[in-house]
Amino acid sequence: MYRIDVFSDWKMILLMSVIMLFQMLLASLIINYFQFSEYLVPISVGALTLTILFDARIGFMSTVAVSILVGLMMGQNIDFVISSLFISTVGVYNIRELRKRSQLFTTMFALIAASVVVIIAIGLFKEQSWAKIILDLQTLTLNSFLAPIITYGLIGLTEMVFEVTTDLTLIELLDYDRPLLKRAQRETNGTFNHSIVVGNLAEACATAIGAHSLLCRVGAYYHDIGKMIKADYFIENQYASDNKHDAIKPTMSAKIIRSHVNNGLQLAKEYGLPKIVSDFIPMHHGTTRVEYFYRQALEAVGGDESKIDESQFRYPGPKPNTKETGILMICEAIEAAVRSIKEPDILKIETMIDKIIKQRIEDGLSLIHI
């Protein structure tokens, strides 16, 4: 089922319903009560808002439904339906992959250009007077100018009321000047660089399969923030110093390594990370095993698995439950494994990737819901 995460959540269905019904109510007030031009009905506002909140498909399909319903309400006004669908489609296309806030306002010019095209086309086709065409053009241009501004305000309101995390918020979380990322750069520079590389890899993978690439990048930036606690116990942060794990037992080493998950969740809560981002912290390991220290412990008891409590070496989970968290789990493991290959070549890298994916599927990554 398409976007089961959205359509199985009553709050998201309520949000979509509220936006669509509000548009129809406004249309009724503008046309029947105030008797203004139908071109003041803010159909494109709903299209932009739903596209940013969810995705382009939901934004487009809801616009089709609302445009047709409002057109019928106006007495089968086909001109309104055509103009609304054309302009809203242009708007949806322009912000389908939002990467910066200014993109929302540059969409304003695309909407205005679309307004000019559709009004002149309809006017010429119906042989309307130029006075009528110019009047409709002025009205629709005003609508197109205000649409992104109103959308920007609505996004902030819906994020607060319905606890939705939009791409606009995710973009803000990528800012290196955010307190948590600045702290990560300062205290765990090795881990931070690793996270940037994993973010690039995860974003590319997500783009290739049609997943949420921006969310993958943001999740990668924050997935290892728990390593700021006891940073020097993680190999990427060990520069000239000795490996502290050499002086402690494998069970203690595994405990310290596993603790970065809970520490990360605590930091995420402290710094107010959205749940959709903090979910990457426990899910990027799922319930996999801290293999290196498990093997050390196994060697210490002569290979007798019955003498080892395996739960001491497993991450608490949960397993990834979205495409994005699944992608990060695989990319994070691949980045670390490929970096360890001596004299790497294409064949060695491909073999390692196949091995990692197979291991993750067998030990933590369920593809049933992904």
Task: Annotate the PLM regions.
Residues 43-45, 88, 196-200, 261-262, ...:
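A generic alpha-helix surface/boundary motif
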Residues 107-113, 135-140, 175, 215-225, ...:
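A glycine-rich phosphate-binding loop feature that marks nucleotide/adenosyl-phosphate handling sites
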Residues 337-366:
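C-terminal structured "cap/appendage" subdomains that terminate the fold
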Residues 2-192:
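Generic detector of multi-pass transmembrane helix bundles and their immediately adjacent loops
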Residues 368-370:
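Conserved small/polar residues in nucleotide/adenosyl-binding loops
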Residues 181-343, 359:
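Divalent metal-dependent catalytic cores for phosphoryl transfer on phosphate-bearing substrates
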